Amino acid sequence: MKTLPSKWLIALSALLLSLNLAAAEIIGKVIAVADGDTITVLAPGNRPTKVRLAGIDAPERNQPFGQKSRQHLADLVFGKEVRVSVVDKDRYGRIVGIVYVPLKIPNGEVIVDVDLAQIESGHAWAYRDYLKGLPAGKAGRYVAAEKDAKETKQGLWTDKNPEPPWQWRKDQRSKRQSGAN
C-alpha cells in the first residue's frame, strides 16, 4: 500500500480541521449577555460557551448606547435556545459565530439572524475588518443594513456622529497609557 508524504497529510489535516470548524454548530440556551455582541450559550454537556457575534461590533458597556445595545440583544436571545453557526475562534478563545433564534409570528415562526438584527436596529456596526470570513452574501447584507439603519436614524444613529467601538477602545487605551505616564 502506498502512503501519502507527510507534508500532504499535514495539509490535508489542516484543510479538514478548517472545514470542520466552518461546518460546526452549537445549539444551546443563552444564559448570559455580556454586551451588544457577546453572549454565553449553555452548550451540550452543560458547557458554558462564550460566543462573539460575527461581523458586528457593538458599543462597549460604558460607551454611549452600550447598555441599549446589550438590552436589545438580551431581549432577542436571553433564556432562548439559539443555533450558532461557528465562523472562527478569536484571540480570547471565544467562538465567533452567526447566532440564529426562532421568533414566533402570527402564522408560525421565523428564524432571525441575530447579528444582522443588531445592525438593522442600530445597535451595532457592520465590523468591516472582520466581514471576510462570513458566508457568501452576509457581508453585503450587513453593510447594507448598517447603511439603512444610519439613513433611518435607528438606535445609535440618532446621534449625529456616534463613535465606533473600535475607535472608542483605542481612545480608552490612549487615555490609560497617558494617565500612567
Which residues does each predicted region cover?
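Small beta-barrel nucleic-acid-binding modules, primarily SNase/OB-fold domains
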Residues: 2-12, 16-181
